Swiss-Prot record:
Its main location: cytoplasm. Residues 387-453, 510-576 form the DRBM domain. This is Spermatid perinuclear RNA-binding protein. Interacts with EIF2AK2. Associates with microtubules; it is unsure whether such interaction is direct or indirect. Transmembrane segments: none annotated. It comes from Bos taurus. GO terms for cellular component: cytoplasm. GO terms for biological process: cell differentiation; spermatogenesis. Residues 357-371, 466-476 have a biased composition (Basic and acidic residues). Keywords: Cytoplasm, Developmental protein, Differentiation, DNA-binding, Methylation, Repeat, RNA-binding, Spermatogenesis. GO terms for molecular function: DNA binding; double-stranded RNA binding; single-stranded RNA binding.
Length: 672
């Protein structure tokens, strides 16, 4: 299975190729203007036809009987001559690409379209277009195609085809009550197959908008494959409706959204598997009532050629050469790799069959992991690449509650541009970015610059509290002094509240987490939430903990900070200064009577630790510690002892004589 990085590389190539074949904004605007103008002009033509038919009917009513006139009037009121105009093809599906911009509309008629109606619409359409716009259009009729061809006279050159059709053409052969409906066709009826194809294109457009438009990367992959069909003659027979069905089935059957590169690979896998070949599953047309194969018009040779080409394209993609499939130059790697300098003798030497890293690169301090880790840490600290608080956080601290608004979103799908704004003291600041988060950050930088605050890493903000500055500079002593002052102020009750607003962690004077250090001294403490105030942008939590009958409180922007503040207050009150010696718990080991009991108790203490102790196999027990002294390490509870010194055993230690005991067989199993 390929790695995610290779798919990301395919995504980059596909999106760059897509940007080259996607129409320019000027071309899209010209398409929109032309289609909208013709749609509005056809609406005016429909109104003109209705007015003309009403006038003709009014003149004929004087020569007919009353009953016949009423019957004719009620029959004519069934609907308009031109029912409506709909977009089909590339315009409706959004699949336009450069040098392939076929624009199509369907003009739905009440009755079966005839040549007479086609000529009438063609003659009146230029008049209605002139009323709407000053641009010049050439209008021609094409009886063989049952359509009207409209061309513009300026760049970019566009061609719009308006096809006449009617639902009666498809419904006339359907059975009603077991009998065929016999209808008399006019003598100048337009080509029936062209009208049926127009109705099918209308169904295809509705199906595509409902099923394929919502799939991620489906439209992008279709544009890429349409360009492939234009470039490679082998793929030309697949262009159109079958290609859209294959892409929808390939991408829509995945259980997760796919990127552009992975979606294109999935379509190629589907074609390379042989679904087009004889004996395969075929391609069902979902827009037909009867079971229909959408690939029935293709020959066996064409299907085999497309399958062979898809397999070759899939192999190129698997070896990271998708740029050959797209016919583009390879893009440089987004992550530069380390290059080694090779000598001429290494390249041209007969014995150097495989290139290797120079031996000198492996020497030095790189083999020492500790030195390498220290050097990397020094680089990170010296580069100052980590900012504890960016411009947006600083602005929210200075002016909490600011409302950021999205003004606009522009640009193509693969490279959007967001514009955000914020109102500060009646002044509106705007900035753009590739994402909403980046745009908000740019707006915050503008506001801070306008207010006179520096935005660099080294700059100090005057509105920051002393706690924030001390945390950013690594001075934990200031935090301790502030917490002790807050503790001393609350003498009216047995509780103490500590207010700490900081971006960094709260630590004790020894550099430990206050909650962890307090838990080492007093286990089983319970922290309770006292209050929660403030809005969503500036919440304040107050936590309380009870230690030795005294209650201590701490506040912070979240529960974790408030809990640490309460623990720090308890440590400062109970375990600092003169109170530290009185509150420390000493581990007392009872003195055993006699030399033997003393040795046994020392041996038990030596083997007791994390988990269950194991007996030694020797017949002698050596005394490694005296009563009251426990060596630090795994032989003590929790691995460390509060009564033992920091390193090793004390210099003055009572030495016990080695006692010899009778040995008993020790079983290799235990039920305890």
């Amino acid at each position: 299975m390929r790695s995610i990085r290779s798919f990301a590389n395919d995504d980059r190539h596909v999106m760059v190729k897509h940007s080259t074949i996607y129409p320019s904004p000027e071309e899209l605007e010209a398409v929109q203007n032309m289609v909208s103008t013709v749609e509005c002009a056809l609406k005016h033509v429909s109104d003109w036809l209705d007015e003309t038919s009403k006038g003709t009917k009014a003149e004929g009513e004087t020569e007919v009987k009353k009953e016949e006139a009423v019957d004719t009037y009620s029959k004519d009121q069934g609907g308009r001559t031109l029912c409506g105009v709909m977009r089909i093809g590339l315009v409706a599906k959004g699949l336009l690409i450069k040098d392939d911009m076929d624009l199509e509309l369907v003009l739905m008629c009440k009755d079966k379209p005839t040549e007479t109606l086609l000529n009438t619409v063609k003659d009146n359409l230029p008049i209605q277009i002139q009323k709407l716009t000053e641009e010049k259009y050439q209008v021609e009729q094409c009886v063989d195609e049952a359509s009207i061809i409209i061309r513009n006279t300026k760049e970019p050159t566009l061609t719009l085809k308006v096809i006449l059709t009617s639902p009666l053409i498809r419904d006339e052969l359907e059975k009603k009550d077991g009998e065929k409906v016999a209808m008399k066709d006019p003598p100048d009826l337009l080509d029936r197959q062209k009208c049926l194809n127009a109705l099918a294109s209308l169904r295809h457009a509705k199906w595509f908008q409902a099923r394929a438009n919502g799939l991620k990367s489906c439209v992008i992959v279709l544009r890429i494959l349409r360009d492939l069909c234009n470039r490679v003659p082998t793929w030309a027979p697949l262009k159109g409706w079958p290609l859209e069905l294959i892409c929808e089935k390939s991408i829509g059957t995945c259980n997760r959204p796919l990127g552009a590169g992975e979606a294109l690979r999935r379509v190629m896998e589907c074609l390379a598997s042989g679904i087009l070949l004889p004996g395969g599953p075929g391609l069902h047309d979902p827009c037909e009532r009867d079971p229909t194969d959408a690939l029935s018009y293709m020959t066996i040779q064409q299907k085999e050629d497309i399958t062979h080409s898809a397999q070759h394209a899939l192999r190129l993609s698997a070896f990271g050469q998708i740029y050959k499939v797209l016919e583009m130059d390879p893009l440089p790697s987004s992550k530069p790799f380390q290059k080694y300098s090779w000598s001429v003798t290494d390249k041209e030497g007969a014995g150097s069959s495989a290139l290797k890293r120079p031996f000198e690169d492996g020497l030095g301090d790189d083999k020492d992991p500790n030195k390498k880790m220290k050097r990397n840490l020094r680089k990170i600290l010296d580069s100052k690449a980590i900012d504890l608080m960016n411009a947006l956080m600083r602005l929210n601290q200075i002016r909490p509650g600011l409302q950021y608004k999205l003004l606009s979103q522009s640009g193509p799908v693969h490279a959007p541009v967001f514009t955000m704004s914020v109102d500060v003291d009646g002044t509106t600041y705007e900035a753009s970015g590739p994402s909403k988060k980046t745009a908000k950050l740019h707006v915050a930088v503008k506001v801070l610059q306008a207010m006179g605050y520096p935005t660099g890493f080294d700059a100090d903000i005057e509105c920051m509290s002393s706690d924030e500055k001390s945390d950013n500079e690594g001075k934990n002593e200031t935090v301790s002094s502030n917490s002790s002052n807050n503790t001393g102020n609350s003498t009216t009750e047995t509780s103490s509240t500590l207010e700490v607003r900081t971006q960094g962690p709260i630590l004790t004077a020894s550099g430990k987490n206050p909650v962890m250090e307090l838990n080492e001294k007093r286990r089983g403490l319970k922290y309770e939430l006292i209050s929660e105030t403030g809005g969503s942008h500036d919440k304040r939590f107050v936590m309380e903990v009870e230690v030795d009958g005294q209650k201590f409180r701490g506040a912070g922007p979240n529960k974790k900070v408030a809990k640490a503040s309460a623990a720090l207050a308890a440590l400062e009150k109970l375990f600092s200064g003169p109170n530290a010696a009185n509150n420390k718990k000493k581990k007392i080991i009872p003195q055993a009577k006699g030399v033997v009991n003393t040795a046994v108790s020392a041996a038990v203490q030596a083997v007791r630790g994390r988990g269950r102790g194991t007996l030694t196999r020797g017949a002698f027990v050596g005394a490694t510690a005296a009563p009251g002294y426990i060596a630090p390490g795994y032989g003590t509870p929790y691995g460390y002892s509060t009564a033992a010194p920091a390193y090793g055993l004390p210099k003055r230690m009572v030495l016990l004589p080695v006692m010899k005991f009778p040995t008993y067989p020790v079983p290799h199993y235990s039920f305890f």
